[in-house]
C-alpha cells in the first residue's frame, strides 16, 4: 500500500479535523502518500481529490467542523455512484480509504468494501448512535455545549421561577438528551428510546412544587417531538407555561474537547495501521478505553441502544 485517501461525510462533528490530522500524519510517518477528498462521497465521484502534506493539517487539532468539507450524496447508494467512486480511486492510484462519519457514511464504506476496495470507518457524529463504540467523535463536545446552555438557562429559570424546555439533537438516539440532562440535573428527560406519559411528567413537576421547587428544566430530544409541541402539550395537562430553547446546529460547532481530540487521534492512527495490515472493511471504536475494530457490516446490523441504567439513574436523581 502506497497511497491512501480520507473523506468526511454527513453531518459535521467536532473532532473530525483532529481525526483527519491523525490519519495524515500517521500515514506520512509510515511512508504513505495521503490524499484528501473534498465534500465526502460527492467529491469522490467528482474527483475532487488533493494531495495532503504534513503542513496541510497544521493548526487543525482545535478547529471544529471539517476542513475537507462535507455533503450528503444519497446517489452513492446506487451501483453507478459506487463504480464512479472506485474509478476515481483507481485513477488517482489510491490503495485504501478512511471514511469519517455516521451511519450513512458507514453504508458508503461498506459498499466500497463489498466491491473489493479496502475501507476503514471512523465514527464521527454528535449523536453517539453508532454501535461498536462507547463514544463517537464529537459527542463529548456537543454534550458540553448543551450542558453549558443548560446551566445558563437554569440561572434564568431560577430567577423567574419558570419551567424551561430545551430541545436538543437526536432524531433516533437520545444520548445527548440523556447525558446532558443527567449532568445538568434536568427534572425530566425525554428520549426516542423510552416512551413517556405527560401525566407522569406533570406529576413529577407537581411533586417538585410541593417541596418548594419553583423552577424546572426538561430536556427533549428532537426525535420525540419539537420543544414547542412538548410545551403545548404540557400546558394542556397542567399550569406549566414553559419557555422553549431550541439549541439546533450550535451543538455541531465549536472547538473539540480534550476527550474528542484524543479519541479522534487514537482512532485516526489505528485506521492507518489497519490499512497497512491489509484489513479493510472494519470500523474502529473505543470500548472501556481500548481501541477496538469490528466488521463494518456487523456494526450496521446492530442497533445502538440507550444506556438503561444511566436513564434510570437520571430519573432517580432528578426527584
UniProtKB/Swiss-Prot annotation:
Pathway: Carbohydrate degradation; glycolysis; D-glyceraldehyde 3-phosphate and glycerone phosphate from D-glucose: step 3/4. It is found in: Cytoplasm. Mg(2+) binds at residue 103. InterPro entries: ATP_PFK, ATP_PFK_prok-type, PFKA_ATP_prok, Phosphofructokinase_CS, Phosphofructokinase_dom, PKF_sf. GO terms for cellular component: 6-phosphofructokinase complex. One of its GO terms (molecular function) is 6-phosphofructokinase activity. ATP binds at residues 11, 72-73, 102-105. The active site is at residue 127. Substrate binds at residues 125-127, 162, 169-171, 222, 243, 249-252. ADP binds at residues 21-25, 154, 185-187, 211, 213-215. Its cofactor is Mg(2+). Homotetramer. NCBIfam families: PFKA_ATP, PRK03202.1. Belongs to the phosphofructokinase type A (PFKA) family. ATP-dependent PFK group I subfamily. Prokaryotic clade 'B1' sub-subfamily. This is ATP-dependent 6-phosphofructokinase. It comes from Listeria monocytogenes serotype 4a (strain HCC23).
